[in-house]
């Protein structure tokens, strides 16, 4: 049986303004920064009527432990960037999250950026590895238009492959072996 999680979540991304932040205020959600030198209060992740509003800061993942998947499943979210950035920021989904607040953290992530490019990577502890060969352009990834960007990202975990889709179109498909796929699903923002 195929299940779906993180469905119909709309995230609104804005860029940081000095003094903004406040950390994670959405009920049930947690965050982890890539760097131990960062401060979660430099960013903002809060509930709003249609989903969540995120103001980026340090590179971070956000998750709710209730959003888990195993076997075959789909994780999906719609992202809207509301302001252009002065440099390449990225955001997207992660799946297979394990030990997210520990030294053995592991997950697979699918990111896009306003240039219309995508990237798939995996994290194992403090190390990351490209799953796809670097940032790549794809017509299915909407770029910035009139200062905004909107994309629905999905990760479909099948019996032997994992498909990464933007707006319903596959941008990559890779073997499931070697990826972290069973576990928590959430979102990632890189600034």
What role is predicted for each listed range?
Residues 14-16:
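N-terminal signal peptide c-region/cleavage motif recognized by signal peptidases
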Residues 20-41:
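Extracellular carbohydrate-recognition regions
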Residues 41-61:
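Short carbohydrate-recognition loop motifs
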Residues 56-128:
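Secretory/extracellular carbohydrate-interaction modules
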Residues 60-68, 138-145, 187:
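Beta-strand-rich interaction surfaces with strong enrichment in secreted/lumenal proteins
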Residues 77, 145-175:
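Carbohydrate-binding surfaces in secreted/extracellular proteins
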Residues 126-152:
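Short, aromatic/His-centered strand-loop micro-motif at the edge of beta-sheets
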Residues 174-191:
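Flexible glycan-contacting loops in extracellular carbohydrate-active proteins
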């Amino acid at each position: 049986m195929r299940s779906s999680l993180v469905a119909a979540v709309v995230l609104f991304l804005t860029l940081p303004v000095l003094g903004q932040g406040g950390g994670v205020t959405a009920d049930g959600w947690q965050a982890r920064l890539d760097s131990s030198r960062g401060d979660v209060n430099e960013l903002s992740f809060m509930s709003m009527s249609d989903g969540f509003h995120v103001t980026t800061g340090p590179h971070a993942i956000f998750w709710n432990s209730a959003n888990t998947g195993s076997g075959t499943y789909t994780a999906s979210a719609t992202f809207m960037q509301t302001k252009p950035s002065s440099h390449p920021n990225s955001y997207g989904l992660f799946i297979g999250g394990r030990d997210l607040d520990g030294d053995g953290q592991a997950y697979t992530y699918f990111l896009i950026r306003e240039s219309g490019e995508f990237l798939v990577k995996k994290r194992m502890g403090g190390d990351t590895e490209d799953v796809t060969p670097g940032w790549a352009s794809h017509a299915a990834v909407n770029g910035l238009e009139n200062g905004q960007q909107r994309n629905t990202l999905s990760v479909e975990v099948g019996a032997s492959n994992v498909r990464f889709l933007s707006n319903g179109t596959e941008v990559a498909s890779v073997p499931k072996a070697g990826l972290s796929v069973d576990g928590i699903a959430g979102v990632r923002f890189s600034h």
